[in-house]
């Protein structure tokens, strides 16, 4: 989990990858917006939508320099304590910018905003607006309210805080998403109803609410018409999707995947974040039937110990997880698997950890988001006694991360001589004769080709391993352009 400056869609900067940047302009009459995004891909998606929204409503243009911005927005994450403290650390830096420019508008959104509410303005009174993940669509109105209050005496000003949970209303008010590049995120549901003992998501984003099926399909079809070829479906518990159909029925997540696969132009499907409980037989069969489904799965498990899973209230066992992955790999032997791991959960014994470590090796994960447990106020786990020292936790985490990194290296090395289906995304910054794309397993693939091929899929034979995430190859076959 990282903190990153918001940049337009397509935006994973890498050694051989070029990205679309916000337009820079010297015209001081143009209002400029800076968004800092913390945390998950849901937040990244929300930041895109904030930019679309304020661009349409107030004409704001994105900038990568907070010093030249007229409005600063921070889209926050509260999963871990350190991430939460980074919010106030960054706000301290933004305070200096506001001292230099009193007209600067500062807004805080996301999960920390939802959790802290007006406490943010008590701790940082120079913050003008606080809004939650479900109320970002009200930003234009909040901005207008702020402008209306500028001339009022301080005693007459009201705090602009909106952290309510108006179901799925926000999607009805967001503009059509802008397209930059050939990949796009599409949020299909919000919130989570699992109430794992360590997690704040149900309290900061609310319980699970699915977008109507027709809305999701219409958004994806619109993106495909604009050249998007890879869709990543998003949700805190994305495979628990149950969207209402036009006829009043319910569409499950596997049914949604099958419908999306029929949309012309969509050549690749990903999703995150999923839960083992809803990783159903029907979902596994989608990997058998739908070539658009990538051979890469992120399925958070959190621990490889049944005792720890029970304390986490995950409501499944390790055997259930292993059985589902075995079925999936029988269909897709080349499946790359990643997961989330919480190390040092309260009560985790040395035996519990060793069970997790062995589990990681047995399932051969090649990527993970692994962290030391972070106590979150208001969660059941925050009341549990924690007797493990920080030194032991750090040692355990290092052991897990080292093994997974070595596994990732082995899997990248094993790509030598294989044929990979690659989405060609851009021309290399370093060499105009080279094209850059991504394989199913997220590795960057570089090869010699015509810039006119950008946006198409190709079969590439891997000829050289450059780094952990970068390989070189040669073109074997260029798929027809579906545009």
Curated annotation (Swiss-Prot):
What EC number(s) has UniProt assigned to this enzyme? Answer: 2.8.4.3
The protein's job, in short, is: Catalyzes the methylthiolation of N6-(dimethylallyl)adenosine (i(6)A), leading to the formation of 2-methylthio-N6-(dimethylallyl)adenosine (ms(2)i(6)A) at position 37 in tRNAs that read codons beginning with uridine.
Q: Tell me where in this chain the MTTase N-terminal domain is found.
A: 31-148
Assembly and oligomerization: Monomer.
| Residues noted as binding [4Fe-4S] cluster 1 in the record, renumbered to the chain | 40, 77, 111
Record's family? Belongs to the methylthiotransferase family. MiaB subfamily.
> Reaction(s) catalyzed by this protein?
N(6)-dimethylallyladenosine(37) in tRNA + (sulfur carrier)-SH + AH2 + 2 S-adenosyl-L-methionine = 2-methylsulfanyl-N(6)-dimethylallyladenosine(37) in tRNA + (sulfur carrier)-H + 5'-deoxyadenosine + L-methionine + A + S-adenosyl-L-homocysteine + 2 H(+)
Domain TRAM residues, every copy: 413-477
User: Which cofactors does this protein require?
Assistant: [4Fe-4S] cluster
Q: Primary place of residence?
A: cytoplasm
Q: What is this protein called?
A: tRNA-2-methylthio-N(6)-dimethylallyladenosine synthase
- Which species is this UniProt entry from? Acinetobacter baylyi (strain ATCC 33305 / BD413 / ADP1)
Q: Where does [4Fe-4S] cluster 2 bind?
A: 192, 196, 199
Q: How is the cofactor bound?
A: Binds 2 [4Fe-4S] clusters. One cluster is coordinated with 3 cysteines and an exchangeable S-adenosyl-L-methionine.
Location in the cell: Cytoplasm
Provide the alphabetized UniProt keywords: 4Fe-4S, Cytoplasm, Iron, Iron-sulfur, Metal-binding, S-adenosyl-L-methionine, Transferase, tRNA processing
Q: Does the keyword S-adenosyl-L-methionine apply?
A: yes
Q: Which NCBIfam families does the record match to this protein?
A: miaB-methiolase, MiaB/RimO family radical SAM methylthiotransferase
């Amino acid at each position: 989990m990282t903190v990153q400056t918001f940049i337009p869609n397509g935006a994973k900067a890498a050694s051989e990858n070029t990205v679309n940047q916000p337009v820079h302009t010297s015209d001081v009459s143009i209002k400029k917006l800076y968004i800092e995004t913390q945390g998950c891909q849901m937040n990244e998606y929300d930041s895109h939508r904030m930019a679309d929204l304020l661009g349409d409503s107030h004409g704001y243009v994105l900038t990568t320099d907070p010093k030249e911005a007229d409005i600063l927005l921070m889209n926050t994450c509260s999963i871990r304590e350190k991430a939460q403290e980074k919010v106030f650390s960054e706000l301290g830096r933004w305070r200096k910018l506001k001292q230099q420019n009193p007209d600067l508008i500062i807004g805080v959104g996301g999960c920390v905003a939802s959790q802290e509410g007006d406490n943010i303005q008590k701790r940082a009174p120079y913050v003008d607006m606080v809004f939650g993940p479900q109320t970002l669509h009200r930003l234009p109105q909040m901005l207008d309210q702020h402008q209306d209050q500028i001339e009022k005496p301080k005693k007459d000003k009201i705090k602009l805080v909106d952290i309510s949970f108006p179901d799925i209303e926000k999607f009805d008010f967001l503009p059509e998403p802008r397209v930059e590049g050939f990949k796009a995120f599409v949020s299909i549901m919000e919130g989570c109803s699992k109430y794992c003992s360590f997690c704040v998501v149900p309290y900061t984003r609310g319980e699970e609410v699915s977008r109507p099926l027709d809305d999701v399909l219409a958004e994806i079809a619109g993106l495909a018409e604009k050249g998007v070829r890879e869709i990543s479906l998003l949700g805190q518990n994305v495979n628990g999707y149950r969207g209402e159909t036009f006829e009043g029925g319910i569409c499950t997540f596997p049914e949604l995947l099958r419908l999306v696969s029929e949309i012309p132009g969509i050549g690749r499907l990903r999703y995150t974040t999923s839960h083992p409980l809803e990783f159903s037989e029907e979902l596994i069969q989608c990997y058998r039937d739908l070539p658009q489904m990538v051979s890469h799965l992120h399925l958070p498990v959190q621990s490889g110990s049944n005792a720890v899973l029970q304390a986490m209230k995950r409501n499944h066992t390790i055997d259930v997880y292993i059985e589902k992955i075995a079925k999936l790999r029988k269909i897709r032997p080349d499946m790359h698997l990643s997961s989330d791991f919480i190390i040092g959960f309260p009560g985790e014994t040395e035996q519990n950890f060793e069970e997790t470590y062995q589990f990681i090796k047995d399932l051969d994960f090649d990527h993970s988001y692994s962290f030391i447990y972070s106590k979150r106020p208001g969660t059941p786990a925050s009341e549990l006694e924690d007797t493990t020292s920080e030194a032991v936790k750090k040692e355990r985490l290092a052991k897990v991360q080292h093994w997974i990194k070595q596994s990732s290296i082995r899997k990248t090395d094993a790509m030598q001589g294989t044929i990979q289906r690659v989405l060609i995304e851009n021309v290399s910054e370093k060499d105009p004769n080279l094209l850059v794309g991504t394989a199913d397993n997220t590795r960057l693939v570089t090869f010699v080709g015509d810039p006119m091929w950008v946006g198409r899929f190709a079969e590439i034979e891997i000829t050289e391993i450059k780094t952990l995430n970068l390989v070189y190859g040669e073109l074997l076959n260029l798929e027809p352009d579906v545009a």
